[in-house]
Amino acid sequence: MGFIKKLVIVICLFVFYRCDSDITQNKKLSDIESLQLKASFVDLKNKKVDLTSFKGKKVIINHWATWCSPCIKEMPGMIKAQQVLKDYNYTFLLVSDENISKISKFKNDKKYDFNFLKSVGSNETFGIYSLPTSYIFNEKGIKIETIVGTVVWDSEKMINKLKAF
């Protein structure tokens, strides 16, 4: 019985910690500039990418990993959404903290047409403890939504929501 009580306490502490970290995360990552200050990114040629260069565009940053099956599951829908939203000024950036060769191999194997980036640092740098996690930024670079978990990006509801931003 003592083990079960300890387990319940540990689970409760984890839940309270997660609630606190989400609140902190939302305050710290309010715009693309604050995200750029927290971390740096490189493309698959190891060239530094400045996120502030995307100001003027709506940006979806999706944090994922090659080992994350929910992340991979949502990618076909994301490809369709990217095509549907091409006239709505959206840029999709898929960010992983894995090494460039692993990301490149995944991109080449799957033949996905995304802007794949490597974050220099871990997902914890962003306050991300669950994958996939996506941030949606408006044209001014202000974060308008954080989505934790799998998204059906090509659903009518999501497409309409993204068109409305």
Located regions from the model:
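Conserved redox-active cysteine motifs that mediate thiol-disulfide chemistry
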Residues: 63-80
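A conserved nucleotide-sugar
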Residues: 86-92
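Short, internal strand/loop/helix patches
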Residues: 93, 104-140
